[in-house]
């Protein structure tokens, strides 16, 4: 079982996610990919990857903005990406608006856990990836750690590591490297306080997050500690995975 949350239709989850993230991105500034701790990994994969796709980047893209295709449910985010030279299309990870085998490098950070039908999401990522393509993705782990924060930001599930590997393998993806990931504060009290302000003082809370908390998180983020295969996830709340699309 991937999540202790009650089942919700995909359409309801989509509406909840669109409402939350449109409000978030409307007041946000775009943060360049080079500023994230994922950039060294991304940069190492760019040379052989001329066709690139990032799913649900918001205003935190990890791939270079120019010459990358972006798909997102947020018109606000896509509009700002376009002003910086990005190519953006409204769409969902469960119905990617692209043909088969069209991309050499795909990023999908913090998105698979948001959809009801994650099997379809993974099938779509597999469909648009060429054989040998790299997929960088991240997901929250351990259903026992489910909290009000997960529900608030529109998560459908947290993953058991073994089940996650099985799901990826069924859709042709093998994990090459991984690392602990995420910028969520470790203090439950701080998370609860942030949620309270987002519920009761939404506009100023979003401004504070976008203009103060997020820039500070980016500035003080630690380098990714990548390891071969899947890391020991016992104490890891969220994991980044570099996967490779198998040829069969």
Describe the function of each predicted region.
Residues 58, 102-105, 132, 141-146:
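A short alpha-helix capping/helix-coil boundary motif
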Residues 60, 126-130:
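Surface-exposed amphipathic alpha-helices with a cationic face
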Residues 49-50, 130-132:
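A general structural motif
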Residues 109-112, 138:
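Residues lining the SAM
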Residues 3-9, 16-19, 27-34, 116-124, ...:
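S-adenosyl-L-methionine-dependent methyltransferase catalytic module, highlighting the catalytic core
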Residues 1-101, 105-109, 122, 179-181, ...:
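Conserved N-terminal segment of class I S-adenosyl-L-methionine
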Residues 76, 96, 114, 142-145:
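Active-site loop signature of alpha/beta-hydrolase-fold enzymes
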């Amino acid at each position: 079982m991937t999540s202790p949350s009650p089942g919700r239709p995909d359409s309801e989850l989509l509406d909840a996610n669109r409402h939350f993230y449109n409000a978030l991105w409307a007041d946000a500034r775009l943060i360049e990919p080079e500023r994230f701790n994922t950039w060294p990994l991304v940069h190492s994969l760019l040379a052989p990857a001329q066709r690139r796709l990032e799913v649900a980047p918001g205003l935190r893209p990890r791939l270079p903005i120019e010459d990358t295709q972006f798909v997102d449910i947020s018109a606000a985010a896509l509009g700002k990406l376009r002003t910086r030279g990005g190519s953006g299309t409204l769409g969902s990870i469960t119905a990617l608006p692209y043909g088969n085998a069209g991309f050499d490098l795909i990023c999908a950070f913090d998105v698979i856990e948001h959809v009801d039908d994650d099997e379809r999401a993974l099938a779509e990522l597999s469909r648009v990836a060429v054989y040998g393509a790299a997929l960088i993705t991240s997901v929250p782990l351990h259903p026992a750690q489910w909290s009000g924060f997960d529900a608030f930001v529109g998560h459908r599930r947290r993953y058991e590591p073994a089940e996650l590997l099985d799901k990826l393998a069924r859709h042709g993806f093998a994990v090459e490297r991984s690392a602990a990931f995420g910028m969520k504060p470790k203090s439950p009290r701080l998370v609860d306080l942030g949620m309270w302000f987002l519920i009761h003082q939404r506009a100023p809370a979003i401004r504070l997050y976008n203009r103060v908390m997020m820039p500070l998180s980016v500035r003080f983020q630690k380098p990714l500690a990548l390891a071969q295969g899947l890391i020991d996830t016992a104490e890891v709340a969220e994991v980044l995975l570099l996967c490779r699309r198998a040829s069969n």
